[in-house]
Each structure stands twice: as structure tokens, then as C-alpha cells.
UniProtKB/Swiss-Prot annotation:
Taxonomy, superkingdom: Bacteria
Protein name stated in the entry: Large ribosomal subunit protein uL16
Function summary: Binds 23S rRNA and is also seen to make contacts with the A and possibly P site tRNAs.
Protein species of origin: Herminiimonas arsenicoxydans
Region (Disordered): 1-23
Gene: rplP
GO-annotated biological processes: translation
Length: 139
């Protein structure tokens, strides 16, 4: 699973996932087809991996997949049946915070029908709304 190799600080505050993805990471840059977020939310490292495996299994040997997001935010929680107080819990997993317009995955080397179906299978593993996009001429 994806997670940072090392961080300056182990724990991070919750923060608010606001705004939209303006220019960076919003276009199909590497492949021919892309899966773009139209909702907002958090995607865990496990969900990123589950979607990648679904796509990889569907396209079999053909094509290439790029993952355009990385889970770099630690989420901590306290163990079950532990009283409140006594500090913040330990980091349990990592998430990628996603704003609308962010490109999640890209694919190349397959025909459009196969890419659409692979992205449909991947989107079922993700907790936010997505759309299929094709690279525009001149990009």
C-alpha cells in the first residue's frame, strides 16, 4: 500500500477539505484516458490499491496505468474502549484528500471501451463520484 516513506511530524490536524483543483492535476497528462473526481472526499491507501487492482485485472496484459494521487495525510484514532483524554491516538492509515476536478488515474495502450469498463470497475471501489475523460487534441 502507498504511504509516505518519512514525515517531519507523525500526526496531523484534521483540517477542512475545501476548494477545487484549479490547474495542477486536472488534465489527462500521461495516458489517453482518465478517471476524474467530480465529488470531494478522502481516499484511503487501501481504496487506491483496490481500484488499481480492479483496473489491472480487467485490462490484463495490455495498457499502462498511472496513479495520479498519493495518500500523504495520516489519520489517527484511539483504540476501542479507551477513555477520552491522554493525548491523540496513533496514526492508523493514510488518505489522499480529493477536491473536485482532480485526476485520479490515467490509462493508455487500450481501446476506449476497455478503458471505460476498467474505470467503471475502479470507480465502484472509490467513495466519491467520478467521470471518464478522454485526452483533448493538443494536450
Amino acid at each position: 500500500m502507498l504511504q509516505p516513506a518519512r514525515r517531519k511530524y507523525r500526526k496531523e490536524q484534521k483540517g477542512r477539505n475545501t476548494g477545487i483543483s484549479h490547474s495542477r492535476g486536472t488534465a489527462v497528462s500521461f495516458g489517453e484516458f482518465g478517471l476524474k473526481a467530480i465529488g470531494r472526499g478522502r481516499i484511503t491507501a487501501r481504496q487506491i490499491e483496490a481500484a488499481r487492482r480492479a483496473m489491472t485485472r480487467h485490462i490484463k496484459r495490455g495498457g499502462r496505468i498511472w496513479i495520479r494521487i498519493f495518500p500523504d495525510k495520516p489519520i489517527s484514532n484511539k483504540p476501542a474502549e479507551v477513555r477520552m483524554g491522554n493525548g491523540k491516538g496513533n496514526p492508523e492509515y493514510y488518505v489522499a484528500e480529493i477536491q473536485p476536478g482532480k485526476m485520479l488515474y490515467e490509462m493508455d495502450g487500450v481501446d476506449e471501451a476497455l478503458a471505460r469498463e476498467a474505470f467503471r470497475l475502479a470507480a465502484a471501489k472509490l467513495p466519491l463520484l467520478t467521470t471518464f475523460v478522454v485526452r483533448q487534441v493538443g494536450q
